[in-house]
Amino acid sequence: MSSLDATTPRYDEFKRIYHLFLFHAHPFWLQLLYFLFISLLGFLMLKALPMKTSMVPRPMDLDLIFTSVSATTVSSMVAVEMESFSNSQLLLITLLMLLGGEVFTSILGLYFTNAKYSSKMIATLPDDDDHGGSGKPPPPTTSPSSTLVELELAPPMDVVVVNPTTTATTHDEVELGLGRRNKRGCTCTTTHTSSSSSASKTTTTRLLMFVVMGYHAVVHVAGYTAIVVYLSAVGGAGAVVAGKGISAHTFAIFTVVSTFANCGFVPTNEGMVSFRSFPGLLLLVMPHVLLGNTLFPVFLRLAIAALERVTGWPELGELLIRRRRGGGEGYHHLLPSSRTRFLALTVAVLVVAQLALFCAMEWGSDGLRGLTAGQKLVGALFMAVNSRHSGEMVLDLSTVSSAVVVLYVVMMYLPPYTTFVPVQDKHQQTGAQSGQEGSSSSSIWQKLLMSPLSCLAIFIVVICITERRQIADDPINYSVLNIVVEVISAYGNVGFSTGYSCARQVRPDGSCRDLWVGFSGKWSKQGKLTLMAVMFYGRLKKFSLHGGQAWKIE
């Protein structure tokens, strides 16, 4: 018999610890441990796999773990030249980006949410042997303290608050299975109602999980196929990839996964600069940035609506109806219809604003010299779309005017679902009021959290301290603006970087050699470690977006 057989006490103990860890731990700690584990495993595998050729020097361990963290947190901060990695290492980085992508991690969240509802449904089934013949009601399975633990599983963007002391059974309590008749005569729901509610949630959550999985798979397969066909049809683009010793299939799958996950890594040293004269490839890559991040809620709703029309399944329509009323299955990517429309409008306005400023300031710049008007327009649009969260560039950011760089910094700072909502829905106002009436302990901890701007200011100060010697000796490369760009880019998990150039040195160093790495790739060990902390903080920023409420500035 196996030591973990389903009938052994050891299996029961393992199952109990498993449920305690996954269903009672705060999502922040679960996700932090997940990203740390994937980053460490990726580093060990990158170190074990051979480099592209024996002539390529093996990077330092710090640079390899920096690359692993950058891929897992989808930040694309480059510390090692991408063309020095072997095909197996590139495929490993592809896997790290896939595992760290927001859509993929949300699928994992749906899986564990479904498991939680299934466990709750089994736990609330009536036991006739224990209670049916005794005439006694079944013991309550939910206490105020356990209610608080379960509610901590709700995503930070969709907070559900229930007051366990209220005497009236609200709709939320019915949904969560908290209503029950007690000895004081409180009008409550039965165990059967709770079980039915859990069964309904299990069905809809599982359905939503399969829809998102299908969306994820279809986008990747379609993107991979389109890029492979383009490289085969357009000889110039295919020659660029082949000339760098990269397989067309590896390039296609790497680029699609990186772009959809909004990482921004490209298997060429120059990034997408090598393909700025191929607007067709840029137009094929560009939609994946929006499909996997800023417009994911929009296309997810469209996909669900299309599937409902084709299949006629009422459960799909129920998902959209619940979200229209402010409900849903705790999946914060499935926004209400009104919020989705405003999100699409906001994204379009921000892209147009960036496009207009870039064309006005950079149309005749050296970075776009030699391109046709159409190629310049596509390149400008590509930069505008990527500035939010992907970070793929078609020109050297250090050559761009300061006004455009500052605008990019603002865009990198904004969360993906930043929305201009002139009129707030009634259910959103009700949710905000109920959130204010939540537990005092949760409110206190939220208020004690520092705001993202405060944390970023501290990180910038720390990096200015760790790099103070380089700032004094090389003030152009190590300008404060370049440091701010690098930190905000790491926080936004974007990957924009001004790079480092030996030509910009005030005191030329004969031993200096230009490398195709980001600006942070030249930082000290302390600076790189600090930036890795920024990457983790940025990847988990959804848990601290409402921090800093204790400060009152008047």
Swiss-Prot record:
InterPro entries: Cat_transpt, TrkH_K-transport. It catalyses: Na(+)(in) = Na(+)(out). Residues 127-147 are annotated as: Disordered. It is found in: Cell membrane. It is a multi-pass membrane protein. The keyword Oxidoreductase does not apply. The chain crosses the membrane at residues 26-46, 90-110, 208-230, 280-300, 342-362, 403-423, 444-464, 518-538. One of its GO terms (biological process) is sodium ion transmembrane transport. Residues 1-25, 111-207, 301-341, 424-443, 539-554 are cytoplasmic. Keywords: Cell membrane, Ion transport, Membrane, Sodium, Sodium transport, Stress response, Transmembrane, Transmembrane helix, Transport. In roots, expressed in cells next to the protoxylem and the metaxylem I. In basal nodes, expressed in the phloem of some diffuse vascular bundles. GO terms for molecular function: monoatomic cation transmembrane transporter activity. Belongs to the TrkH potassium transport family. HKT (TC 2.A.38.3) subfamily. Substitution of Pro-140, Arg-184, His-332 and Leu-395 in salt-tolerant cultivars indica Nona Bokra and Pokkali confers enhanced sodium transport activity. Sodium transporter that under salt stress mediates sodium exclusion in the phloem to prevent sodium transfer to young leaf blades and reproductive tissues. PANTHER family: HIGH-AFFINITY POTASSIUM TRANSPORT PROTEIN-RELATED (PTHR31064:SF30), POTASSIUM TRANSPORT PROTEIN DDB_G0292412-RELATED (PTHR31064). This is Cation transporter HKT1;5. It comes from Oryza sativa subsp. japonica.
